[in-house]
A protein has these predicted regions:
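Conserved recognition-core residues within compact binding domains
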Residues: 2-107, 114-140
Length: 140
């Protein structure tokens, strides 16, 4: 169960994210699958305090909606800058919070269909094809 669903809130989730990111280690598989993007994410995970500070900042700036979404930004999916790169806030929340290195095919999906949402319990990952199927289901 997500800490948000259990009512414990952002602080518990941030603590969980800290635990997850501290367990990150590069291994032989990382070396075999290394790309420029994966190396960038690995370096972000290794800069733990910077990653967690940015994560905490955006989580605390988000506003809760009636649907339980944590909306960050005014219009559309909000981009943030970190370590010289611009990424979507929801990507930072999902990949850093779970200490998962995305591959080129991985995307963060919104179960709530709200691209402004950064609520970790509303986010999951999959492929671009999964994302398209989500959109078709939402429209039907």
């Amino acid at each position: 169960m997500s800490p948000f669903e259990g009512g414990d809130g952002i602080d518990v989730w941030i603590t969980e994210a800290c635990t997850n990111i501290k367990t990150f280690e590069r291994d032989e598989l990382f070396d075999l699958l290394a790309t420029e993007t994966r190396v960038w994410w690995a370096e972000l995970f290794e800069a733990q305090s910077e990653a967690i500070d940015k994560l905490t900042s955006i989580m605390n700036e988000a506003a809760t909606t009636q649907d339980g979404c944590l909306e960050f930004g005014q219009k559309g999916a909000q981009r943030i800058s970190i370590r010289g790169k611009r990424i979507y806030a929801y990507q930072l929340v999902y990949w850093v919070g779970n200490a998962l290195l995305p591959s080129a095919q991985d995307v963060v999906r919104h179960k709530c269909h709200n691209r402004r949402c950064i609520n970790p319990s509303h986010l999951t990952h999959g492929s671009q094809a999964d994302n398209r199927l989500d959109e078709l289901e939402r429209r039907s």
